[in-house]
Amino acid sequence: MAQAPKKATAKKTAAKTLNFHQQLVTNQWLLNFFNPNTLTGLKERLEHAKFEGIDEDGQTKFFHELCNSLFNKHLVDENTLRRYDLNIVKHWQQITERRNYHEGITLHLKYFQYLSLLVAEIYLDWYFAKTEDMLLGLNQQLALFNQEQSLDQQFELYSQDDLNKVAYWSATGRGK
């Protein structure tokens, strides 16, 4: 990950207070894969129950909605997104198979569960298959972040060794 903030050589300036989400450079980089590139915007588009479930073609309904302009096709093409989605479906079905059978229901992914799994797919794919592109993208995002910071709040660029360290946090917002 980005290294500790650099020491300021000049007199400290009043640092602008950032909220937790503004400081998550990796999160900001991953949000660039989506249109809109905010969690609030994605929630507004995907939270509806009509997008839950799997279509006849084996893809999630979220996948079809993402293909309708919610995904940045300059970063990931539709076939790659399709592969991510099919992997999510495969794992979700394995995870829920016994519970679905015993309870006589079919559990469907909620939008926040789906997005969590999708960003994990993206991160892992880029980490293993597109390492240099990932490093470049993260450092571009970090440069944008650093432009808004005082010198003592800036972070050093990522190195390839930093990419295998990632914190994963997912919350439903329901206080559980």
For the regions a language model picked out, list residue spans one by one.
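Charged, amphipathic alpha-helical stretches
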Residues: 2-78
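Conserved pre-motif I regulatory segment
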Residues: 67-170
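Conserved glycine(s) of the Walker
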Residues: 175-176
